[in-house]
């Protein structure tokens, strides 16, 4: 397994998109910080910091792309045959891809968190990161919680993207499905709230689980909408992620080479 993970990491970090897309996101982060410094009445640096200067939103798209191509490209270029000829089991191959994506996603989040801290110190250093008010948590805690909620919700999207990418031949389809799933929460949130109010069991659907990204920093407000406590959202996300990844393993084992 260790050898497979090293090989997958090598292939991932050899791709230009692995570096180009994060660099683009960093440029966007820097741009928002500069705009916030110049036009504080339009761009709120505190709110921008909480969202990692928008990096926590963009990173989801980055990981959807990586998840959609990590499987489909193996079959597109026929490199999957080389792995199978070396007597690696299909389960080991696909699990190594999961681990590689986990490693990459952790690195990316850590990089964006560090850059967010640096940008805050440069452009808004006079504002305390650790000061608590009576009704609000500190800026640092808010940013870290947002990162955690986004990370969990992102993996829910990624697990579905991996499943679609394993079933379909085109990575474009899985990318589209992942992006639609990501935006679906905000698009149908009003409708979903009405449905959950009428049939409370619907609250366990995967779209509602995506609300962990916002509820994690404002539990009192959003639990009235999701009808779920924060720990229930974490458990629900974990269960759905495991289910989707297990289905990916099953689909991968049955996929024709």
Regions found by a protein language model. Name each.
Residues 67-90, 257:
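Transmembrane helix boundary and interhelical loop/hinge segments in multi-pass membrane proteins
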Residues 1-22, 170:
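Aromatic- and glycine-rich beta-strand/loop motifs that create alpha-glucan
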Residues 31-39, 167-208:
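Transmembrane helix segments
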Residues 28-69, 95-166, 211-237:
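Secretory targeting signals
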Residues 22-26, 101-117, 177-199:
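Hydrophobic alpha-helical membrane-insertion segments
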Residues 16-18, 89-95, 170-173:
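Membrane-helix interface segments
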Residues 17, 235-257:
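Junction motif at the cytosolic side of a transmembrane helix
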Residues 64-67, 76, 80, 115, ...:
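Hydrophobic/aromatic residues in alpha-helical transmembrane segments
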């Amino acid at each position: 397994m260790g050898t497979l993970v090293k090989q997958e990491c090598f292939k991932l970090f050899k791709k230009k998109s692995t570096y180009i897309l994060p660099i683009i996101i960093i440029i966007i982060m820097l741009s928002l910080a500069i705009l916030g410094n110049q036009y504080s009445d339009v761009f709120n640096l505190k709110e921008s910091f909480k969202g990692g200067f928008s990096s926590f939103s963009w990173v989801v798209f980055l990981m959807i792309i990586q998840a959609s191509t990590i499987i489909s490209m193996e079959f597109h270029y026929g490199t999957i045959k080389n792995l199978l000829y070396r007597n690696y089991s299909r389960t080991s191959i696909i699990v190594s891809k999961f681990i590689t994506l986990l490693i990459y996603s952790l690195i990316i989040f850590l990089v964006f968190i560090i850059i967010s801290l640096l940008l805050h110190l440069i452009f808004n250093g006079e504002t305390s990161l650790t000061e608590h008010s009576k009704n609000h948590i500190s800026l640092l805690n808010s940013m870290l919680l947002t990162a955690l909620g986004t990370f969990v919700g992102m993996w829910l999207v990624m697990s579905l993207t991996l499943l679609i990418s394993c079933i379909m031949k085109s990575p474009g389809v899985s990318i589209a499905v992942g992006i639609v799933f990501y935006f679906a929460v905000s698009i149908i949130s009003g409708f979903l709230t009405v449905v959950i109010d009428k049939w409370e069991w619907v609250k366990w659907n995967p779209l509602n689980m995506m609300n962990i990204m916002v509820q994690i920093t404002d539990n009192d407000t959003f639990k009235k909408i999701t009808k779920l406590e924060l720990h229930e959202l974490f458990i629900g996300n974990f269960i759905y992620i495991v289910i989707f990844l297990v289905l990916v393993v099953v689909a991968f084992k049955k996929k024709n080479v």
